[in-house]
Amino acid sequence: MEKVVLAFSGGLDTSVCVKLLQEKYNMEVITACVDVGQPEDEIKKPEAAAQKIGSDKHYTIDAKDEFAKEYAFRCIKTNSLYEGYPLSTAYARPLIAKKIVEIAKKENASTIAHGCTGKGNDQFRFEATIRSESDLDIVAPVRDYNLTRTEEQDYAREHGIPLPSEKIYSIDENLWGRSIEGGLLENPATAAPEEIYEWTKSTVDAPETPQIVKIEFVNGEPVKINDEELEPVALIRKANEIAGNNGIGRIDMVEDRIIGLKSRENYETPGAILLITAHAALEKLIFSREEIKFAENLSQKYAELVYNGLWNEPLREDLDVVNDHMQQRVTGTVEVRLHKGSMKVITKESPYALYNEENVSFEDKGIDQREMIGMVKYYDLQGAEYSKVKRE
């Protein structure tokens, strides 16, 4: 009997997939859950659920450190935001797929399975990475059988699959952020209720006193918060805690999915927003004007590649090479004031700063103003010629 490794969360979709793979595909099912910073119970529950449903074997893979260092920190270094969102779900998918491939190779499996539907982004993200990392077959039972939510529930009851507790919202959570969708949130005319948020306080409940956060960067990566040196996972968690407590990081947006659907999405990404904001401010102190323009274009393109699941696209690796070189100078300290949902960079310093106080001072003669006369005279020469042509 051939083996299949199923990316397993313990939710309805992947729970139904276990039985479908055994019944419809006649395969030995190995389930695997990859820990990228989910709540502890979301790591423990899949193992118990897999055993109850009848998985032949289960793996739990701790990938938090790799996710923080190689993926979340890459988001910071590139300031990558897709339509204003720091890609907490999208950055996790290629790592999860990579770990599933590693298990499949270890088990000599012929196939990898996932529980994605045919309407979402994750089918593209998972399968693009799986195909780049291996020649294994891929199946997606829920999509392949075109199952609705109700049909999945009926199938689960018929096959004795314990139904997960009914949730109003679909929630995906990892170290870098939480995404909340479904239920009444599907109507963009309906305000998101306070109950959906767990990481962030409302502006009403946030502290009355502003908090100043000091973040130190080395080569573009955050290394200290408030002078405390922290490993990547701990640093991100600290940033989430501080920013979330001050009402930072709520995003309510209508997002353009890969297949063209518009989807109402709610996110909590307090630490990501704080760290990216501080990092971008430091870059503006250090980079030249042309570097800043280029970095903005790089950020947008990088975010598109990650969102679209193109982690193994050669261009992404090319951009990493350029970005890593630029980040060698992004070393310094930034202070950010947080207060009731607002965030403002108040100080920044770096040994690589291109800012020259002497040159910009109103009191200092670092630059002889008279030398500007000739430069200003011919500034916008083409604009002047264009206006002359119009007049004639």
Curated annotation (Swiss-Prot):
Is Amino-acid biosynthesis one of the keywords? yes
- The gene name reads argG
The protein's annotated pathway: Amino-acid biosynthesis; L-arginine biosynthesis; L-arginine from L-ornithine and carbamoyl phosphate: step 2/3
**Hey, which family's this protein in?**
Belongs to the argininosuccinate synthase family. Type 1 subfamily.
Please tell me whether the keyword Transferase is annotated for this protein. no
For this protein, what is the EC number? 6.3.4.5
Q: Where does L-citrulline bind?
A: Y85, N121, R125, S170, S179, E255, Y267
This one is known as Argininosuccinate synthase
Which reaction is the catalytic activity of this chain? L-citrulline + L-aspartate + ATP = 2-(N(omega)-L-arginino)succinate + AMP + diphosphate + H(+)
NCBIfam families hit by this protein: argG (TIGR00032), PRK00509.1 (NF001770), PRK13820.1 (NF010392)
Gene3D superfamilies the UniProt entry points to: Argininosuccinate synthetase, chain A, domain 2, HUPs
Q: How does it assemble?
A: Homotetramer.
PANTHER family per record? ARGININOSUCCINATE SYNTHASE
Where does the protein end up? Cytoplasm
Q: What class of enzyme is it?
A: ligase
Q: Which GO terms describe its molecular function?
A: argininosuccinate synthase activity; ATP binding
Binding positions for ATP?
Answer: A7, F8, S9, G10, G11, L12, D13, T14, S15, G115
Q: Cross-referenced PROSITE patterns, in alphabetical order?
A: ARGININOSUCCIN_SYN_1, ARGININOSUCCIN_SYN_2
The organism named in the record is Methanosphaera stadtmanae (strain ATCC 43021 / DSM 3091 / JCM 11832 / MCB-3)
Keywords of the record, alphabetical order, are:
Amino-acid biosynthesis, Arginine biosynthesis, ATP-binding, Cytoplasm, Ligase, Nucleotide-binding
Q: Name one Pfam family in it.
A: Arginosuc_syn_C
Any one of the GO CC terms = cytoplasm
